[in-house]
Amino acid sequence: MPFTTLQVFSSYSLLKSTIRLNEYVATGKLLGYKQLALTDDGVLHGAVEFYERCIQNGIQPILGCTFEVAWKSDASKKEMLVVYAKGAKGYESLLKLSTLYQQGLTWTSEMTEWIGSHSEDVKIVLPPMDSEWVAAHSKGRLEAVLGAVKEEYDGIEIAVGITREMVERGEFDTMREGIEAAGVIPVAFSVSHYLNTTDYFPWKVLQAIRLGETLSFTQEDATGSESLPEATSMTKVFQTAVDGVLLSNLEQFTKDLVVEIPLRDTMLPKFPVPGGKTSAQFLYELCEAAMLDMGVTTPVYVNRLKEELAVIHEMGFDDYFLIVWDIMRHAREKGIQTGAGRGSAAGSLVAYLLHITGVDPIRYHLLFERFLNRERYTMPDIDLDFPDDKREDILAYIVSKYGNQNVAQIVTFGTLGAKQVIRDVCKVFGENIITVQKFSNNIAQGKVTLEQTYKENKTFTGEAGGNNSYKNSSSEKVETSKKHTSMDNNSSDSTEKKPENNDETSKVESDNTESDKETKEQETEETESRVNKPDNNELEIIPSN
């Protein structure tokens, strides 16, 4: 009966966790975990990365999400839920819930209704921290409150989390009868916002950055209790506590939280081909007609076309090329300027004949194999360039033709670079602008890390030592933390209480030096969840997985 930490936040819960997924999975494996859970705050940004890393390390991934939702019966009552996926349908339900949550339906009954209508696909845990059900226990209303929650989510398996501390204080003994009377399952529980106990203070610094608050370091801040515990030691604790019931309940609760994400499947919408033809037939006809119109009918073109179409069909991308052709056709019909094409797609004769690109690959000796290759299965990557003010028109056309469910845009994550993290950490400790500039100006411009700076810049190393060592360690720990998301030219800031000029792309204070101002304007570092972010005037065509 191995222990599993049921609530874990990663850096994808923007500025709420110091846990990076690569470190989480590696540490979890070292600590003896057979299962690892990811339950970020309302988002599933890290789900695919987490899933892949777990599978590669022989660990069962448990996918969940943390939501604060209102009750259907009383919207003034809110409860923190961790919702877990059971199978593929459960994962799809989590995606839908995450969408509702991010659309601002955090505290409405719509989420409650959606969860209730998918009772076979999900499970729920009520964490004990700051919860109404734990508060109700002290008022003698535990059974009534849990019974009401059970009624809200009728048909769903619901558990309450019982921590090691609750067992050791004897708290669970006093509430066990009420929990079981309400028909709710008590399970062994812990929560992690950081990996190691010594990461507690850097995590507090991260929260201060998010909330725009200041801190001072005390020795009590050296370690914390919400780290990732060792699986073996927690198993022993809960095996001996209350007849091992919490651990056995945990095992039963998690055994069917199994999800398989079809990572390598091609999920393209079908292009509406006219006249009852197949996509391959229609694609061939378009290319053949274009060859005649363009006067490129010599054997070298004919043979190249046959070869490319064979590869495209064999790899299942006939519809992909028709979709992109149709988008470009629509743009030209509406008088929207299009680019001539760039990157490896310029090596495709099919793309040239469909006017997706404007470069003849045979004339310029460009290789199709660099774009698509039987020996290396990858999706085609075609970048389409449109004017900034026409992007929404193009997107609206795509949505109208294929539906919202088949169209997606790519999120990017602004991260804390070396200069910005030093600024933010100094502000957290109430340093004046001169001190902030002194630290910041000793860091080279560009994508340089704090570790590099410590090694290469003795002046900075001297400034960062001594009484500033805790700032140094905190800065290193929160460096590269994801700070905000953006899509196209819009940004969604992660701050709950947004401090003035906190974001790395915002304007700096008026008394900053000119060089510091230039650096700050340049510093936003972007990382992507799956593919490169398009330029502002570029639309990248990818399948919506």
Regions found by a protein language model. Name each.
Residues 446, 454, 462, 466-544:
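Mature, Sec-exported extracytoplasmic domains of Gram-positive
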Residues 1-467, 471-473, 535-545:
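Alpha-helical scaffold/interaction cores of sigma-54-like transcription cofactors
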